A protein has these predicted regions:
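Bacterial N-terminal signal peptides that target proteins for export
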Residues: 1-11
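Bacterial N-terminal signal peptides
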Residues: 10-19
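Short, flexible, surface-exposed loop segments at domain boundaries
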Residues: 25-353
Length: 353
């Protein structure tokens, strides 16, 4: 975005009067902001009994106040500071785990709670007086932690994708971090469920396990498929990569598959090229063998839906929304404001306008 700077020349009018002096106008000092990215060194909560409690953390040696009611962006959900202290298996309402210290996320946490891999924090806020106060923050093991490769095989018993080069040796083991079983086996049924951290799970509502068009995908419970992840949703050949899920083709290059049900997910299959994001998780504590607990998987497949048929899906890669806002009064008018917006994404039904 082009930045413009306007220089304003001010003319000072000096008024002399008996017994009175007028000072020159002074601009108000703006509140300084900050943005930090670094490892989570310390994390604390003020009141374990308050689900919306305030807290504090240390990042890059800087102590930051986490105000009450702050929602923290995780890979697939939003949590409060108090939620971070419910452990790897926080449960769900009304049977939530009791919050207790430490969180197991900070480098200062002592064994056996010390994380084997440090967590990364992004935080933005304001400096009020002598205090850094967070306004937005996110936690991930690594913000840009991604991998890619071909699905060489699928271990249905443990819900694991074995990923590597096509025709080459196996290199990565990827499991969906899925406590509820939205995209396949729930974590407790995978044999390593207690080792996954539900705080970093995949979003169960807005599907992050998708084709390139945004069609939701899954790992079947068995090689025969299941009712929520039927094999027929990959076309007649069982591993088609570009087709229309429905009776009417959306494009000649994406043939219609009437048996495909757009309200169901499409199974990931051997031979699919995928990219994935997640966190390194020890399969056997202390043994140094890791797998990826994925919160997002994107398959290089083009699965569409019939024109005008519901449901249709949208995948948004980037959204820039201008909020306009009230203009600053002079002389503080160096403001870039716009009401325009930009979306970059894909849809299963490009005929819709």
């Amino acid at each position: 975005m082009n930045r413009r700077t306007r220089f304003i020349t001010s003319v000072a009018l000096i008024v002399l009067s008996v017994g009175m002096g007028v000072d020159g106008a002074r601009g108000q000092t703006p509140t300084p902001s900050f943005a930090l990215v670094g490892h989570l060194e310390q994390l604390d909560v003020k009141d374990l009994n308050d689900p919306l409690s305030a807290g504090s953390m240390v990042v890059n040696g800087t102590r930051i106040t986490l105000p009450r009611n702050l929602l923290i962006k995780m890979p697939g959900q939003y949590l409060t500071v108090n939620d971070l202290f419910r452990g790897k298996l926080p449960g769900k309402a009304p049977a939530l785990a009791v919050a207790s210290k430490p969180s197991g996320l900070a480098l200062a946490d002592l064994p056996p709670h010390k994380p084997p891999v440090p967590f990364e924090v992004e935080v933005i806020g304001n400096i009020i007086g002598t205090e850094y106060i967070a306004g937005w923050m996110s936690i991930a093991q690594l913000g840009l932690h991604t991998g890619a490769g071909f699905i060489q095989s699928i271990d249905y018993a443990t819900g694991a994708l074995i990923v590597g080069p096509e025709g080459g040796s196996s290199m990565s083991k990827v499991r969906i971090n899925d406590p509820r079983g939205t995209y396949g086996k729930p974590n407790p049924s995978k044999g390593v469920g207690s080792k996954m951290d539900d705080r970093f799970a995949a979003d169960p509502g807005n599907a992050p396990i998708v084709s390139q068009t945004g069609f939701p995908m899954c790992i079947p419970l068995s090689a025969a498929g299941d009712s929520n992840c039927p094999l027929t949703n990959r076309g007649t050949g069982g591993n088609e990569k570009r087709f229309t899920c429905g009776p009417v083709s959306v494009d000649p290059t994406a043939p219609a598959r009437p048996a495909c049900l757009p309200g169901k997910k499409a199974p990931l299959r051997e031979g699919d090229y995928i990219t994935y994001s997640g966190m390194l998780t020890e399969e056997t504590p202390g043994a140094g063998n890791f797998f990826i607990a994925a919160h997002a998987i994107s398959s290089l497949t083009g699965i569409y839906t019939s024109p005008g048929a519901d449901p249709a899906y949208v995948l948004i890669e980037e959204a820039i929304i201008g909020t306009l806002g009230a203009p600053f009064p002079p002389p503080n008018d160096n403001q870039e404001q716009t009401s325009r917006f930009v979306f970059v994404g894909f849809t299963t039904d490009p005929t819709r306008r």
